[in-house]
A protein has these predicted regions:
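Short acidic (Asp/Glu) patches
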Residues: 49-52, 61-69, 108-120
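Generic structural signal for secondary-structure transition and capping sites
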Residues: 19-20, 63, 110, 139
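Charged, gly/pro-rich active-site loop segments
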Residues: 2, 75-176
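Short beta-strand segments
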Residues: 18-50, 66-67
Length: 176
């Protein structure tokens, strides 16, 4: 088994090919972590949620962390984003940002999962979705492979096309 630190560029590439992560936020010294779907664009992550604990906590403390990974049988990559929450309010100031977030998210299958599935029994009016951006302030990443995959640089099983990028990334940083 080997593992290697990813460059910022390679870490951002992992984000560009990933849509599910775990968002961590803190309020009153208490951490909270939840799954979120996101879309990466221009050094930011875009997502949405219905009103609730996650939004309340990020409003109180906009410093957040997102962990995202890609795991396969013989190789993996994981990144951690340190960033700042910014709510994209339904105002003229954020109109284009909200449209961008919506367009980026719609490109992903099941993009509304996690953020849009909260139930609100007895609500007279359905909750309004809250779009937000996480501006990336710092990112770290690591990748690795089994000893067999690291030794010969090949996979023992075929790699589906949608996962080819991860194998190429690993081969580019594989030790000699």
């Amino acid at each position: 088994m080997w593992n290697h630190e990813l460059s910022t560029h390679a870490s951002l590439k992992v984000l560009a090919h990933t849509h599910l992560g775990r968002l961590a936020c803190v309020r009153d010294k208490q951490p909270y972590i939840v799954p979120v779907n996101f879309a990466y664009n221009d050094h930011s992550l875009y997502s949405f949620s219905l009103p609730g604990q996650k939004i309340a906590w990020m409003r109180d403390n906009p410093l957040v962390c997102i962990e995202a990974d890609q795991m396969r049988r013989e190789y993996w990559a994981t990144v951690v984003v340190f960033g700042r929450y910014e709510e994209l309010t339904d105002t003229p100031k954020f109109r284009e940002d909200r449209m961008l977030a919506f367009r980026l998210l719609q490109e992903r299958a099941m993009w509304w999962e996690h953020g849009g599935t909260k139930t609100t029994p007895g609500a007279a009016v359905p909750p309004v979705p809250i779009y937000y951006r996480i501006s990336i302030e710092r990112i770290t990443g690591r990748c690795g492979a089994t000893a067999e995959a690291a030794h010969d640089g090949k996979q023992t099983k075929s790699v589906p096309d949608e996962q080819e990028w991860l194998l190429e990334l690993l081969q580019s940083v594989r030790p000699p």
